[in-house]
Amino acid sequence: MSSVRAFLAIPLPWQLQESIRVIQTELQASIAEARWTRPENLHLTLHFFAKIEQETLEKLKVSVLSVMGCQRSFQVEVKGLGAFPNPHRPRVIWLGLEPRGQLEQLYRATGQCLHQAGLTTDSRPYSPHLTIGRLREDKLDLSKLFSSRQQMTIEPLNVDRLILYESRLRPEGAQHIPLLTVNFDDKNTDIHNAT
């Protein structure tokens, strides 16, 4: 049986992608060694599956449709710059999201979908963020740069749909293929066939 890399995520509208691209361009002067996330690949990850069997993927689609069909849209502010594991030894560069409460509720609701499909959720606490870049080594201290941008804000993210993506790794970077789109506020839902 074949398996795929997949993840559940909130997509970003092109305007927000463009605003983030501008931030990435500004940061490149200070963080030249970073690999920046391509704007079209920017998203808010809820759950990632390194390997998921096709049969389980189909169960997950059914569960997501049943649980998320009545979800209401909401907005979060894109605010502040940070890094994992921390700004003193960064590996992942991210933009923060506030308030976190509704995102955490959405994470728990989608976690129910995973359990219904026979999957487990990550045991670490959920930390909503937008990954905008990665560093191969954590030898750069970015704490001063990041502290000067803690109050930085750009346009809000309208959380109005959820997409189940397949992630195909390519030499030029990951390709994200939508498999299922659930529109919030009782709007139409789309099931995609990956090719």
Language-model regions: role of each:
Residues 1-195:
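Histidine-dependent nucleotide/RNA phosphoesterase domain, centered on the 2H-phosphoesterase fold
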